[in-house]
């Protein structure tokens, strides 16, 4: 029987085969006509790739059927080298959680009155405390500095 093989260039080859012929035999006949080695050939019929050991009748290939020839692509992407670091990774700073830290800002006296231990920023308002640097007070929010009088 006669089958057609359509190549990548759009050229159609006619082959004389039997339904009992294997895909290997068909590929060797294509090699004789086109010079493409069988290990680089992929034959497609009805959207399926044809395996080498099977016969034409296994795929229900009848007379005047058209097979599509595509070339096999070898390999994949180039392997990338793993980065080697010369210095060890910097250890991330871990926040130390202090339980009941708010007790450091206020003091309760014997009479039950609450007194602030730190000064509040006059620019930022209540709740923003100034850092005490001995000779001066500093606001971390608005970056104001207040000098203490001696």
UniProtKB/Swiss-Prot annotation:
Zinc finger (C4-type) boundaries: 121-142
GO annotation terms (biological process): translation
Cross-link Glycyl lysine isopeptide (Lys-Gly) (interchain with G-Cter in ubiquitin), sequence positions: 6, 11, 27, 29, 33, 48, 63
Keywords: Cytoplasm, Isopeptide bond, Metal-binding, Nucleus, Ribonucleoprotein, Ribosomal protein, Ubl conjugation, Zinc, Zinc-finger
GO cellular component, one term: ribonucleoprotein complex
CDD domains per record: Ubl_ubiquitin
Cross-link Glycyl lysine isopeptide (Gly-Lys) (interchain with K-? in acceptor proteins) mapped to chain: 76
Gene3D superfamilies, per database record: 6.20.50.150, Phosphatidylinositol 3-kinase Catalytic Subunit, Chain A, domain 1
Disulfide bonds: none
GO molecular function: structural constituent of ribosome; zinc ion binding
Pfam families in alphabetical order: Ribosomal_S27, ubiquitin
Domain annotation Ubiquitin-like: ranges: 1-76
Note: Ubiquitin is encoded by several different genes. Ubi3 genes code for a single copy of ubiquitin fused to the ribosomal protein eS31. Ubi4 is synthesized as a polyubiquitin precursor with 5 exact head to tail repeats.
Similarity comment: family membership: In the N-terminal section; belongs to the ubiquitin family.
Stated name of the protein: Ubiquitin-ribosomal protein eS31 fusion protein
Source organism of this protein record: Kluyveromyces lactis (strain ATCC 8585 / CBS 2359 / DSM 70799 / NBRC 1267 / NRRL Y-1140 / WM37) (Yeast)
């Amino acid at each position: 029987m006669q089958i057609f093989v359509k190549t990548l260039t759009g050229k159609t080859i006619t082959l004389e085969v039997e339904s009992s012929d294997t895909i290997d035999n068909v590929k060797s006949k294509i090699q004789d006509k086109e010079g493409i080695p069988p290990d680089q050939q992929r034959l497609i019929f009805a959207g399926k790739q044809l395996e080498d050991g099977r016969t034409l009748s296994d795929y229900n290939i009848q007379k005047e059927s058209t097979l599509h020839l595509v070339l096999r692509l070898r390999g994949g992407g180039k392997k990338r080298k793993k980065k080697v670091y010369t210095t060890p990774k910097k250890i991330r700073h871990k926040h130390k959680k202090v339980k009941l830290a708010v007790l450091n800002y206020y003091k309760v006296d014997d009479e039950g009155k609450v007194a602030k231990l730190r000064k509040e920023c006059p620019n930022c308002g209540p709740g923003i405390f100034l850092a005490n640097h001995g000779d001066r007070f500093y606001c971390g929010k608005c970056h104001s500095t207040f000098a203490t009088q001696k």
